[in-house]
């Protein structure tokens, strides 16, 4: 009890002397078991191949280039590689996962499947995709891409129906209509297989609206059927709109198995790529750094929408992105955020990263790691310390049990001694 009171007193004295230990706006790690996924702002290979080699192009400290803990590609993102022919095989593994990518698919690219489509739907898809990625990488160590083999018994081939600018959708694949079908009112199937990973993130997408072809309107209908378990996953078009709709995607987390892709109307779609999730781990929140352009280009907030506690911590700069290499590369604020990767930190929270694990001026919310157990609330004259009550409650219970044991032992020996005297 004396030690506890001394700890409380010392902590309050430290607080009164101004030891704030505030949360810092960085991404960091508990130890060396971490990994970063990124784009050009952390792509060391891209900088090496430029002439001259100018590391001001990156927000990442070049001291980390040889760490072996980075998977980044200039001009790309995990979402872009997942859906489109512009592909990079993001691959990495760690207990603590950090993401700093996403701006290579934003409203600036204005992607939509058809001329009457909607980029807003694709921003919605982006948010749903990253929600699944962040949630699952809080419980899995390893992320990579795998191809999904499929077998379609018809003669029709996949078609590039959904494209805009340089972006061509190839996941899921569209199977063209068979030549002997006069319209799109038909049912068609394809087998696909998932193997080699613990779980997979795969797309299930439909045109949610009335799709017009040759004066006829069609309602999209797509299903995946797990032939091993009998579980079926499906989407049907529910909107009556004829313009301004686009390819709505849901992102399913599926186990290994044999599947059947089924279309009851319009074109059959079948997944061709999947995020491969491997090696379950203890729950560890991921960290996400906002990925946005200079204000001269339009960005979105979908990674922020997807990154929610307790599974994700979001870090952002309070100012416009203004790079020193060019306006979109080498920003001081984001370089500062990534500087936390140069050192270990004991505690992570929604507010930021704590450098020390004793006392803080801010109580950590959604904390992870070895976090401060006390927050000092400074009044003008007297520091008042507020502590996490759980350790005190447990200590009180242990002290109470110890007192009871001592009393029982004393009574036992007193009775035993009295019995011996009586016998004598």
UniProtKB/Swiss-Prot annotation:
<feature type="topological domain" description="Intravirion">
    <location>
        <begin position="414"/>
        <end position="424"/>
    </location>
</feature>
<keyword id="KW-0261">Viral envelope protein</keyword>
<feature type="glycosylation site" description="N-linked (GlcNAc...) asparagine; by host">
    <location>
        <position position="89"/>
    </location>
</feature>
<feature type="region of interest" description="Receptor binding">
    <location>
        <begin position="128"/>
        <end position="266"/>
    </location>
</feature>
<feature type="glycosylation site" description="N-linked (GlcNAc...) asparagine; by host">
    <location>
        <position position="301"/>
    </location>
</feature>
<keyword id="KW-0378">Hydrolase</keyword>
<dbReference type="GO" id="GO:0106331">
    <property type="term" value="F:sialate 4-O-acetylesterase activity"/>
</dbReference>
<feature type="glycosylation site" description="N-linked (GlcNAc...) asparagine; by host">
    <location>
        <position position="54"/>
    </location>
</feature>
<dbReference type="GO" id="GO:0046789">
    <property type="term" value="F:host cell surface receptor binding"/>
</dbReference>
<dbReference type="GO" id="GO:0019031">
    <property type="term" value="C:viral envelope"/>
</dbReference>
<dbReference type="InterPro" id="IPR008980">
    <property type="entry name" value="Capsid_hemagglutn"/>
</dbReference>
<feature type="disulfide bond">
    <location>
        <begin position="113"/>
        <end position="162"/>
    </location>
</feature>
<dbReference type="InterPro" id="IPR003860">
    <property type="entry name" value="Hemagglutn-estrase_hemagglutn"/>
</dbReference>
<keyword id="KW-1043">Host membrane</keyword>
<feature type="disulfide bond">
    <location>
        <begin position="197"/>
        <end position="276"/>
    </location>
</feature>
<keyword id="KW-1032">Host cell membrane</keyword>
<keyword id="KW-0732">Signal</keyword>
<dbReference type="GO" id="GO:0001681">
    <property type="term" value="F:sialate O-acetylesterase activity"/>
</dbReference>
<keyword id="KW-1015">Disulfide bond</keyword>
<feature type="glycosylation site" description="N-linked (GlcNAc...) asparagine; by host">
    <location>
        <position position="417"/>
    </location>
</feature>
<comment type="function">
    <text>Structural protein that makes short spikes at the surface of the virus. Contains receptor binding and receptor-destroying activities. Mediates de-O-acetylation of N-acetyl-4-O-acetylneuraminic acid, which is probably the receptor determinant recognized by the virus on the surface of erythrocytes and susceptible cells. This receptor-destroying activity is important for virus release as it probably helps preventing self-aggregation and ensures the efficient spread of the progeny virus from cell to cell.</text>
</comment>
<feature type="glycosylation site" description="N-linked (GlcNAc...) asparagine; by host">
    <location>
        <position position="236"/>
    </location>
</feature>
<dbReference type="GO" id="GO:0016020">
    <property type="term" value="C:membrane"/>
</dbReference>
<keyword id="KW-0348">Hemagglutinin</keyword>
<feature type="disulfide bond">
    <location>
        <begin position="347"/>
        <end position="371"/>
    </location>
</feature>
<dbReference type="Pfam" id="PF03996">
    <property type="entry name" value="Hema_esterase"/>
</dbReference>
<feature type="glycosylation site" description="N-linked (GlcNAc...) asparagine; by host">
    <location>
        <position position="153"/>
    </location>
</feature>
<dbReference type="Pfam" id="PF02710">
    <property type="entry name" value="Hema_HEFG"/>
</dbReference>
<dbReference type="GO" id="GO:0019064">
    <property type="term" value="P:fusion of virus membrane with host plasma membrane"/>
</dbReference>
<dbReference type="GO" id="GO:0020002">
    <property type="term" value="C:host cell plasma membrane"/>
</dbReference>
<feature type="signal peptide">
    <location>
        <begin position="1"/>
        <end position="16"/>
    </location>
</feature>
<feature type="topological domain" description="Virion surface">
    <location>
        <begin position="17"/>
        <end position="392"/>
    </location>
</feature>
<keyword id="KW-0946">Virion</keyword>
<protein>
    <recommendedName>
        <fullName>Hemagglutinin-esterase</fullName>
        <ecNumber>3.1.1.53</ecNumber>
    </recommendedName>
</protein>
<comment type="similarity">
    <text>Belongs to the influenza type C/coronaviruses hemagglutinin-esterase family.</text>
</comment>
<feature type="transmembrane region" description="Helical">
    <location>
        <begin position="393"/>
        <end position="413"/>
    </location>
</feature>
<feature type="region of interest" description="Esterase domain 2">
    <location>
        <begin position="267"/>
        <end position="379"/>
    </location>
</feature>
<feature type="active site" description="Nucleophile">
    <location>
        <position position="40"/>
    </location>
</feature>
<feature type="glycosylation site" description="N-linked (GlcNAc...) asparagine; by host">
    <location>
        <position position="358"/>
    </location>
</feature>
<feature type="region of interest" description="Esterase domain 1">
    <location>
        <begin position="7"/>
        <end position="127"/>
    </location>
</feature>
<keyword id="KW-0325">Glycoprotein</keyword>
<keyword id="KW-0472">Membrane</keyword>
């Amino acid at each position: 009890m004396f030690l506890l009171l001394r700890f409380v007193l010392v902590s309050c004295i430290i607080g009164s002397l101004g030891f704030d230990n505030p949360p810092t706006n960085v991404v960091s790690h508990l130890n060396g078991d971490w990994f970063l996924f990124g784009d050009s702002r952390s792509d060391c290979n891209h900088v090496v191949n430029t002439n001259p080699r100018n590391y001001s192009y990156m927000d990442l400290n070049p001291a980390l280039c040889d760490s072996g803990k980075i998977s980044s590609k200039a001009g790309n993102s995990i979402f872009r590689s997942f859906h489109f022919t512009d592909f990079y095989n993001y691959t990495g593994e760690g207990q603590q996962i950090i993401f700093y990518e996403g701006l290579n698919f934003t409203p600036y690219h204005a992607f939509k499947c058809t001329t009457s489509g909607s980029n807003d739907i694709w921003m919605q898809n982006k948010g749903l995709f990253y929600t699944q990625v962040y949630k699952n990488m809080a419980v899995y160590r390893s992320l990579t891409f795998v191809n999904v083999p499929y077998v379609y018994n018809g003669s029709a081939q996949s078609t590039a129906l959904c494209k805009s600018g340089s972006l061509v959708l190839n996941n899921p694949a569209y199977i063209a209509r068979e030549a002997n079908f006069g319209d799109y009112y038909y049912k068609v199937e394809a087998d696909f297989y998932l193997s080699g990973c613990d779980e997979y993130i795969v797309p299930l997408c439909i045109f949610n609206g009335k799709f017009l072809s040759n004066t006829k309107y069609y309602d999209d209908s797509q299903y995946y059927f797990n032939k091993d378990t009998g579980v079926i996953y499906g989407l049907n078009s529910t909107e009556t709109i004829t313009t301004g709709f686009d390819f709505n995607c849901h992102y399913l987390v599926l186990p290994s198995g044999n599947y059947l892709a089924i279309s009851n109307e319009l074109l059959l779609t079948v997944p061709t790529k999947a995020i491969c999730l491997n090696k379950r781990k203890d729950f560890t929140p991921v960290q996400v750094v906002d990925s946005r352009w200079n204000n001269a280009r339009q960005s979105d907030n979908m990674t922020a929408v997807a990154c929610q506690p307790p599974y994700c911590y979001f870090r952002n700069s309070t100012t416009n992105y203004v790079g020193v290499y060019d306006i979109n590369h080498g920003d001081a604020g984001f370089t500062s955020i990534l500087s936390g990767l140069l050192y270990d930190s004991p505690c992570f929270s929604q507010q930021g990263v704590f450098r020390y694990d004793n006392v803080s001026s801010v109580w950590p919310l959604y904390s992870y790691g070895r976090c401060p157990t006390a927050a000092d609330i400074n009044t003008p004259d007297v520091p008042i310390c507020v502590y996490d009550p759980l350790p005190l409650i447990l200590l009180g219970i242990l002290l109470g049990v110890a007192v009871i044991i001592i009393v029982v032992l004393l009574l036992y020996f007193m009775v035993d001694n009295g019995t011996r005297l009586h016998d004598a």
